[in-house]
């Protein structure tokens, strides 16, 4: 198959996305697929090639390390030689239209909030992951929490603040609380807040990345994550940071966090409850093909932190580790994702197909 692995783009999670994209591309080529890496925002200079010839080259780097630098839109705009700020870079759409399917390795921003998915649906381009409606709801932590609560899924209390309200706010919860961008990921802009002064500075930082902030009650407990691929929940992975909390550095730089799968001393009933809730959360949010659900577990049960509709696929990402613990290697995982979504297309069961029936 001809497969475009679409990554990069204009997002604070750009560097994570590129690392995911390189690894996915290399794995697909090892599986005999004509996979090529394309940066959504920077595009591809054909340099005399035909679109078909693009698939002859992986177009990847051997460097999978992730910089801890958080790029702003202004930083990323400077990377594009033509000075354009259009979402799709040169030749991206033409190359994607020539593919049998596009593997979305985008994280955050327009790649995860449904905009790219909507453009592809309009243009008849097949892609992995969920459709635009489910992606938009899931990317917005306020919307997704409201959907989860409506369906009886336990999640921490929360309150939303908008940028135009300013940072001088009070919250209806006791400290500590967690402050994060409403539509962010990879813990960019996320803070654990212990007092009113920290709340104001935390909101100021969040508003650098998003027009909306979500403040959540702090939920103590053990932290877990479960991947769901084609309706099947993998075994949980427990996340144990060696110091501090599970921020960007702890997620993507080696040596800061221990990932334990299967988790030790976890009651099987609790483990099964997390699996059931993970599948239920995917279902109520309308997520398809694959995703990841993050949890806290304590004496009061399991609490969904958030859902991830395009989870990371880097060397330290959780979903590949969970799959490997269940006997599914990285190459088989990416092929399961591709084949699972192609089956949904064939059965007319994608979001676009269901909405037009």
Swiss-Prot record:
Any idea which positions bind Mg(2+) 1? 294, 306
Query: How does the cofactor bind to this protein, according to its record?
Result: Binds 2 magnesium or manganese ions per subunit.
Tell me the SUPFAM superfamilies matching this sequence. Glutathione synthetase ATP-binding domain-like, PreATP-grasp domain
Q: Where is the protein situated, by its record's location annotation?
A: Cytoplasm
* UniProt GO molecular function: ATP binding; D-alanine-D-alanine ligase activity; metal ion binding
Describe the reaction catalysed, as an equation. 2 D-alanine + ATP = D-alanyl-D-alanine + ADP + phosphate + H(+)
**Gene Ontology terms describing biological process:** cell wall organization; peptidoglycan biosynthetic process; regulation of cell shape
Q: List the disulfide bonds.
A: none
Q: Where is Mg(2+) 2 bound in this sequence?
A: 306, 308
Q: Which Enzyme Commission number(s) are listed?
A: 6.3.2.4
Per UniProt, ATP binds at 172-225
Top enzyme class: ligase
GO CC annotations on file: cytoplasm
Which pathway does the UniProt entry assign to this protein?
Answer: Cell wall biogenesis; peptidoglycan biosynthesis
Q: Which UniProt keywords apply?
A: ATP-binding, Cell shape, Cell wall biogenesis/degradation, Cytoplasm, Ligase, Magnesium, Manganese, Metal-binding, Nucleotide-binding, Peptidoglycan synthesis
Give the matching HAMAP family. Dala_Dala_lig
Q: Which family does it belong to?
A: Belongs to the D-alanine--D-alanine ligase family.
**Which PANTHER family has this protein been placed in?**
D-ALANINE--D-ALANINE LIGASE, D-ALANINE--D-ALANINE LIGASE B
Its annotated function is as follows:
Cell wall formation.
Q: Under which name does UniProt file this protein?
A: D-alanine--D-alanine ligase
Q: Which organism is it from?
A: Lacticaseibacillus paracasei (strain ATCC 334 / BCRC 17002 / CCUG 31169 / CIP 107868 / KCTC 3260 / NRRL B-441) (Lactobacillus paracasei)
């Amino acid at each position: 198959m001809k497969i475009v692995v679409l990554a990069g783009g204009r997002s604070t999670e750009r560097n994570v996305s590129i690392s995911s994209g390189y690894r996915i591309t290399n794995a697909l080529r090892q599986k005999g697929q004509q996979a090529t890496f394309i940066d959504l925002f920077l595009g591809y200079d054909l340099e005399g090639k035909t679109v078909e010839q693009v698939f002859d080259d992986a177009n990847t780097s051997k460097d999978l390390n992730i910089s801890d630098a958080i790029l702003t839109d202004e930083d990323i705009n400077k990377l594009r030689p033509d000075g354009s700020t259009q979402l799709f870079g040169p030749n991206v759409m033409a190359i994607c239209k020539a593919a049998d399917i596009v593997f979305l390795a985008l994280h955050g921003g327009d790649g995860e909030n449904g905009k790219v998915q909507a453009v592809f649906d309009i243009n008849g381009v097949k892609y992995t992951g969920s459709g635009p409606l489910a992606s938009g709801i899931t990317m917005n932590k306020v919307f997704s929490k409201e959907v989860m609560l409506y369906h009886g899924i336990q999640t921490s209390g929360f309150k939303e603040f908008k940028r135009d309200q300013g940072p001088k706010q009070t919250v209806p919860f006791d400290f500590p609380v967690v402050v994060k961008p409403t539509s962010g990921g990879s813990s960019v802009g996320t803070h654990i807040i212990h007092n009113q002064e920290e709340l104001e500075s935390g909101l100021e930082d969040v508003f650098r990345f998003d027009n909306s902030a979500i403040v959540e009650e702090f939920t103590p407990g053990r932290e877990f994550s479960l991947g769901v691929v084609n309706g099947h929940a993998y075994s949980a992975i427990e996340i144990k940071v060696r110091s501090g909390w599970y921020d960007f550095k702890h997620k993507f730089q080696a040596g800061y966090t221990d990932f334990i799968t299967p988790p030790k001393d976890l009651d099987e009933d609790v483990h099964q409850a997390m699996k059931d809730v993970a599948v239920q959360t995917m279902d109520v949010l309308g997520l398809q093909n694959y995703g990841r659900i993050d949890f806290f577990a304590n004496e009061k049960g399991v609490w969904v932190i958030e859902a991830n509709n395009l989870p990371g696929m880097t060397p330290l990402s959780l979903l590949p580790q969970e799959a490997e613990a269940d006997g599914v290697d990285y190459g088989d995982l990416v092929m399961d994702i591709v084949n699972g979504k192609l089956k949904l297309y064939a059965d007319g069961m994608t979001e676009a197909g269901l909405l037009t029936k």
